[in-house]
Amino acid sequence: MMTEKSNGVKSSPANNHNHHPPPSIKANGKDDHRAGSRPQSVAADDDTSSELQRLAEMDTPRRGRGGFRRIVRLVGIIRDWANKNFREEEPRPDSFLERFRGPELQTVTTHQGDGKGDKDGEGKGTKKKFELFVLDPAGDWYYRWLFVIAMPVLYNWCLLVARACFSDLQRNYFVVWLVLDYFSDTVYIADLIIRLRTGFLEQGLLVKDPKKLRDNYIHTLQFKLDVASIIPTDLIYFAVGIHSPEVRFNRLLHFARMFEFFDRTETRTSYPNIFRISNLVLYILVIIHWNACIYYAISKSIGFGVDTWVYPNITDPEYGYLAREYIYCLYWSTLTLTTIGETPPPVKDEEYLFVIFDFLIGVLIFATIVGNVGSMISNMNATRAEFQAKIDAVKHYMQFRKVSKDMEAKVIKWFDYLWTNKKTVDEREVLKNLPAKLRAEIAINVHLSTLKKVRIFQDCEAGLLVELVLKLRPQVFSPGDYICRKGDIGKEMYIIKEGKLAVVADDGVTQYALLSAGSCFGEISILNIKGSKMGNRRTANIRSLGYSDLFCLSKDDLMEAVTEYPDAKKVLEERGREILMKEGLLDENEVAASMEVDVQEKLEQLETNMETLYTRFARLLAEYTGAQQKLKQRITVLETKMKQNHEDDYLSDGINTPEPAVAE
């Protein structure tokens, strides 16, 4: 038996962690003794490296510790690097926004329990895994699936009807149709399964219970139509022949999914008017296509070329190939349904009936086109028309008041800037139908980068922040406009969103400082901080260099907002004092004097309150004393009456008692 040492040093418990002696082996190949077991508590993601380490230890006597161990170490390094780089990192939330929004709402689902606990937890784990395959109808994956299922539905609606009418189309591309038909059938079956795994909202929560999902879908009309659309009517091919695609007309019953895709796309798209027009055009083209196919089928049943109304005889080479057949029928259908006319008049009664029906459909199509397109164009131009009406009203007023041409040109340029930069939308009017919570969240998301730079909002309470954001009013200033002048009473504070402002001298030319996007001014003057050397007046002239987009918060709006948040008001005032102290604009003597005045006023108020309490206490004490006296008097009267009643009872008992009989 041979025992291996590491560098001539006997292994000990202290160094077993670094050097694991290999097991001793007999000549016959059997283990003489087993190596001491070492603890192996490894995570699931370390299984690979642990197995490689074990192989390295077993392979050490034959190959040495150098080469293979370096390979194992390299594999471990690569694995750690891959896990570190490919692990998805959650985006860090913005703390400023989280103070308002609060923690993220976790996904909550409803399910029916059976009231029985699983002994080993396997049933519960299986159900949880099964619930992972429930699609949220408001999610992106569900929308993508609607697109997938809409394609075979549209394929069947267009080509299945055409193949049933144009026999050449069916025969010439039979293999292609066979593949597409059964591919669409596969998608239909998959859609039926997905519908069984599509969640729905119950009391505002997404239901993922399989039984509820199944019952919710099976008891609907759509389930019956979906099942009817996948009935294997292709078996009729064995009776009527393979070139009879009309036996698959039940596939047209799956139309609801295509309409659902169109509805969701109209909601999701950023260009709803364009999509509505495209959708309307698609419907009209499908109707014209169907009408062309029906015209060809009627011509086939009557006979090609038997009169001037039907399709010409297909024996004529000019009209005997597939492309000419379809284009001719599509042309005839378009002329008829658009009521343009100029088509051969009908000859037979059935031809007259079909043309009358087509004319009625054409009138409805024309009315639909005019109505929908007119409505869409009106909606698209509504904003422009409203804005133009405002400009016309201002122009009329300036002409009536004989405003100078320079001022009129300035006003027109201001309106032009608003329209060019898409600043004509009234945010309050657009968002008025949303609840206050959503309006505030949208405002914070839109104006977050600007609000974060306002110093007095840094430690602002979330509720007050909501109130202030909703009260911000956008204002646009033209080049050369004064936002405020030195000595003016400050009634608003301003936050610069876009543009450049200059702090200028009284001459309006000399510039002292330049304010850019994110800067704010006037926030101290609206807080009425006592001891401020600035008071509530502006100390500088601020002028717009170009067109500037600002947010305005009035003093009245701020005071109205902080009325319900007295603690937040104190925080704002304290932060304002800190800013004034840093800038040397706080008069401490005046602050101390104001504090003394405040203390004196509070003492006087306290004395007044104490006097009021004393008066109320004296009145209550007098009422209590009077009530006690009345109570005592009533008790005395009751005692007197009780004594009198007792004496009367005693006397009556003595008179009515009979004398004892005398014994004779």
From Swiss-Prot:
Q: Record-annotated residues binding 3',5'-cyclic GMP? A: G522, S525, R538, T539
Transmembrane feature ranges: 147-168, 179-199, 225-243, 249-267, 275-298, 322-356, 357-381
Top-rank taxon of the source lineage equals: Eukaryota
Provide the species name.
Mus musculus (Mouse)
Q: According to the UniProt record, where is the region C-linker?
A: 382-458
| Biological role | Pore-forming subunit of the olfactory cyclic nucleotide-gated channel. Operates in the cilia of olfactory sensory neurons where chemical stimulation of the odorant is converted to an electrical signal. Mediates odorant-induced cAMP-dependent Ca(2+) influx triggering neuron depolarization. The rise of intracellular Ca(2+) levels potentiates the olfactory response by activating Ca(2+)-dependent Cl(-) channels, but it also serves as a negative feedback signal to desensitize the channel for rapid adaptation to odorants.
Membrane topology term reads: Multi-pass membrane protein
Where do the record's region annotations for Disordered lie? Answer: 1-61
Q: Indicate what this protein is called per its UniProt record.
A: Cyclic nucleotide-gated channel alpha-2
Region: Ion conduction pathway; residue ranges are 272-380
The family assignment reads: Belongs to the cyclic nucleotide-gated cation channel (TC 1.A.1.5) family. CNGA2 subfamily.
Record comment regarding domains: The C-terminal coiled-coil domain mediates trimerization of CNGA subunits.
